[in-house]
Amino acid sequence: MTDLTTSAIERVLRNNYLGHLAYLWQGKPHVIPITYYFDPADNTIISYTSEGHKIDAMRKNNSVTVQVEEIQSMFNWESAMVHGTFEELEGDIAKQKLHSFIEGVKSIIRRKERREVEFINEFSSKLYSRGIPIVYQVKILEIAGKRRET
């Protein structure tokens, strides 16, 4: 196993839209899958959610981790990990970031999966599940990555 370079870590983040978000709730770590978009211009991870356990936890403790992997086989994979700070967005900034998220994910799906998606509900059901979406970003403080290949 070897460490990934910064540019390789950013490539893993740029080329994917599904990852895992880790946060603390009542002293215990929780890890859940998320749909995300890596914004290299702002060095942030953008996502959204609705009211509930996850958002309550991140509002109380804003230290989070996002992990993303590309797995070809048990002996051939790359993993990127981002440590950062949760920040809830509102108003025009939230709208702009949600637009960036939607367009960014659509672009990745077009490139990687060779299919067209027109609406957010084609790759994420959260928007229509419970109320108004809560847009947030993870300000990246530290990154790390590993690679295994044979």
Region locations from a protein language model:
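Short, structured patches in soluble enzyme cores that scaffold and shape functional sites
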Residues: 25, 68-70, 139-142
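Short beta-strand segments
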Residues: 16-50, 66-67
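Helix-adjacent hinge/juxtasegments
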Residues: 54-89
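Structural motif corresponding to alpha-helix initiation and N-cap regions
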Residues: 6, 51-52
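Beta-strand-connecting loop/turn residues
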Residues: 41-43, 62, 141
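Charged, gly/pro-rich active-site loop segments
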Residues: 78-150
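Short, basic/aromatic recognition patches
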Residues: 1-20
